[in-house]
Amino acid sequence: MAVQQNKKSPSKRGMHRAHNALVVPGIAVESTTGETHLRHHISPNGFYRGRQVLKTKSEA
């Protein structure tokens, strides 16, 4: 079983955990339709940055 050789100081412990923070996902609002979607992703109705890039099933 692995056992530490020396005690890790509170400073080193904090530096070790520096990248463990939870991050809230970036939510964007589509300017044309007002729908919310993840940043850099297409909105559910096929719009990206104000332009329609995919046709939905109802439009096809």
Curated annotation (Swiss-Prot):
An example molecular function term from Gene Ontology annotations: structural constituent of ribosome
Organism: Albidiferax ferrireducens (strain ATCC BAA-621 / DSM 15236 / T118)
Transmembrane residue ranges: none
Chain residue ranges for the region called Disordered: 1-21
Keyword line: Ribonucleoprotein, Ribosomal protein
Biased composition (Basic residues): 9-19
Protein name: Large ribosomal subunit protein bL32
NCBIfam families, sorted: rpmF_bact (TIGR01031)
InterPro entries: Ribosomal_bL32, Ribosomal_bL32_bact, Ribosomal_zn-bd
PANTHER family recorded: 50S RIBOSOMAL PROTEIN L32, LARGE RIBOSOMAL SUBUNIT PROTEIN BL32
Biological process (GO), any one: translation
GO cellular component: large ribosomal subunit
Family the UniProt entry places it in: Belongs to the bacterial ribosomal protein bL32 family.
